[in-house]
Regions:
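N-terminal auxiliary interaction/assembly segments of multi-subunit proteins
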Residues: 1-140
């Protein structure tokens, strides 16, 4: 499932924000705004997906989508929730079109503004422009 989410995140970088990126199997180094949503496969497996963006990246995403050069904290949080929904929603579509298990998702929730250190089964960092996006998945 994590590979499907990473594919969706790469698609987000390439097609939504149109920025070059690289992926590493590491934790983000910067302090990030973090959101999560829960995923349940049709087999009954449950996971929590985390998406986090540092302030540089989420502001850049906000500027791309909203045209705001300097967004307030509430707008950045809303943009993070929308980014999380776009990425995990895209992963759901990818799963439907491939051999991966289908799943349902909940509404994204704001988690925290801190280091990306929550317990998880897998972590990846996507380096985009001068920013970082963290992706993590945890079985529930």
């Amino acid at each position: 499932m994590l590979s499907t989410i990473l594919q969706a995140a790469e698609n987000f970088c390439a097609h939504q924000i149109r920025l070059p990126h690289t992926i590493e199997s590491t934790l983000p180094k910067k302090r990030t705004l973090i959101a999560y949503l829960d995923i349940e496969t049709h087999d009954g497996d449950k996971h929590r997906a985390y998406v986090g963006c540092d302030s540089v990246l989420i502001q850049h995403i906000s500027e791309i989508f909203l045209g705001e050069e300097e967004s307030d904290e509430e707008t950045l949080t809303d943009m993070l929730l929308e980014t999380t929904n776009m990425i995990i929603g895209s992963a759901k579509v990818i799963a439907l079109e491939s051999a991966h298990p289908e799943f349902t998702i909940t509404t994204p929730h704001f988690f925290q503004h801190d280091q990306f250190t929550m317990p998880a089964d897998g972590y990846h960092t996507i380096y985009i422009a001068d920013g970082e996006m963290g992706i993590a998945l945890k079985a529930l």
